[in-house]
């Protein structure tokens, strides 16, 4: 049965840092706990997986990460404050390029700035940078920079403010 971890259970996770008033489901999986920082007021829902045995994951204040999400911090993932990462979002800082005869690994940091909203089942690829107050539509695939206050959906970028 799903529930939020108690203060003692949060402390016993032995993350690099866990802030105050965080709500983390007991069904969240962590790999590389010593490389994961979660600031105050953040909520992470059921069946989310955070992998940082190589690299790191930093999550800002008052951010929500919906259930069934996956964050892979091989080269680093930085998520700002007051973000909403919807259910099923995948964030990768490592990927593979099979377009040539030889497999080439792509390792690039992902930066998600403050007050960003990412819709359900979106995929954020290595090297992506999403600036403040931007929105990513559900099912979108981001592989580049989304400038401040823009909406990216259906492979289009639109200024929203």
Feature-to-residue mapping (PLM):
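Conserved beta-strand positions that form and line the central face of beta-propeller blades
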Residues: 27-29, 49, 141, 151
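Conserved catalytic segment of ABC-fold P-loop ATPases
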Residues: 131-134, 147-149
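Acidic, glycine-centered active-site loop in nucleotide-sugar glycosyltransferases
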Residues: 148, 153-156
């Amino acid at each position: 049965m799903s529930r939020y971890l108690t203060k003692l259970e949060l402390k016993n996770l032995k993350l690099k840092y866990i802030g105050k008033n965080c709500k983390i489901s007991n069904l969240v999986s962590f790999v590389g706990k010593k490389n994961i920082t979660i600031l105050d007021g953040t909520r992470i829902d059921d069946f989310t997986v955070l992998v940082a045995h190589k690299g790191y994951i930093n999550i800002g204040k008052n951010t929500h990460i919906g259930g069934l999400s996956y964050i892979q911090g091989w080269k680093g993932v930085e998520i700002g404050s007051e973000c909403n990462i919807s259910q099923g979002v995948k964030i990768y800082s490592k990927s593979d390029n099979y377009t040539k005869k030889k497999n080439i690994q792509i390792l690039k940091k992902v930066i998600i700035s403050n007050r960003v909203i990412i819709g359900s089942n979106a995929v954020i690829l290595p090297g992506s940078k999403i600036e403040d107050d931007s929105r990513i539509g559900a099912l979108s695939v981001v592989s580049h920079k989304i400038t401040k206050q823009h909406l990216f959906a259906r492979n289009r970028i639109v200024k929203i403010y």
